[in-house]
Amino acid sequence: MIQAIGLIANRVGVEIQQYSHIIIPEVVKNVNDTKQQVVDSTFTTLSRWVIHQDKVQSTILLPILPYFSTAIKTSKSRYRVLQWFLDTIPSCEGKDIRPIIPIVLDGLLDKAKETRTVATSLLSMILTKWSNEAFLKEAAKRRPIDASQLKTMIL
């Protein structure tokens, strides 16, 4: 079913955006599935949803970003989401990417080294194109020990 959604999105093209609020929240929930095939299909579908004419369409990607913050339940799913962001977010230069900031910060504090590594790469990429102000503001809302650690990473 998930693969079919991706194929339909691919065929429909950028007009698929009008269905994002209905379909994407349900698709994103699958990032936590225990079956690797389901998780892989989920990210393939998400890519087909946002990539048209061989480029990420920021007008489609940006509205779906908020759905990820409630979907991530494990370190493994956080890693995969951050990796997907690393591949897709560069197309959003100059746009509002604030919905992913808490996810990136959680990734920086994650217990899993691979998750921290991809979060650090994503943060570095983001900070070359966007201001660190929103990251610092969000980090300040965390526990003092976490806020201090995050501030060091952000600056």
Say what each PLM segment does.
Residues 1-155:
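Extended, low-complexity, acidic/polar intrinsically disordered regions
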